[in-house]
Amino acid sequence: MFSPRRLLVAVPCLTAALAAVLTAAPAASADLVSLSACNSNTLSRYFSPWADPAYYELAPGGSFSDSSWTLAGGATLVSGGEPFAVLGSVSPNSLSLPSGASATSPSTCVDAAYPDIRFFVAGSGTVGVNVIYNGTVIPSGVVPAGGSWMPGPITVTGSAITGAENGGTAQIQIQLVGLSGNPEVSDVFIDPFHGG
């Protein structure tokens, strides 16, 4: 039987193992992953009020102001979102993810410089964060909802791995899955510099 607690333990262990494999590679292969950003989107310190000084960019369709994400299993766009106006105004929409529902972003370019995903979450239950690369769903983390709107913890995209496999850059999709309860998600961001 699936247990969110087991996933909370398994994901960091898998990430650490993959990082160890990558860092153990010969020095000659160290230049396989480009450290340049895939694009030149606007970066800002959206989470600085919560002691996160990293620069982030909005993921494609990450404000849920349009219907660019693919929704399945009862996922819906609903009125209201994070009240902190990190994008300049209060978010008018959010994503409702009842248990079993999923939402998948449009494709976006990542490389070793795009390691983290972060978003705002409210409601109850948990959200699974996956990265889809080359048709493979890669679990990246579990984000708990705690009632009112707050930033969720940082989850890892695995972009160094996908970028290394694909010659420097890769096209991925972000998939959010309702694992339990009825969480809501607002404003999905990618950190292109891993905390700096």
Predicted regions located by residue number:
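Bacterial N-terminal signal peptides that target proteins for export
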Residues: 2-12
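Extracellular carbohydrate recognition and processing domains
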Residues: 50, 135-169, 175-184
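Solvent-exposed strand-to-loop "edge" motifs in beta-rich extracellular domains
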Residues: 65-69, 108-114, 118-126, 177-179
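Hydrophobic residues on conserved beta-strands that form the core of alpha/beta folds
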Residues: 61, 105, 116, 151, ...
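Short beta-strands within extracellular/lumenal beta-sheet-rich domains
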Residues: 87-116, 126
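Short, surface-exposed beta-strand/strand-loop-strand elements in extracellular ectodomains
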Residues: 128-135
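Extracellular carbohydrate-recognition regions
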Residues: 31-78, 189-196
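C-terminal segment of classical bacterial N-terminal signal peptides
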Residues: 17-27
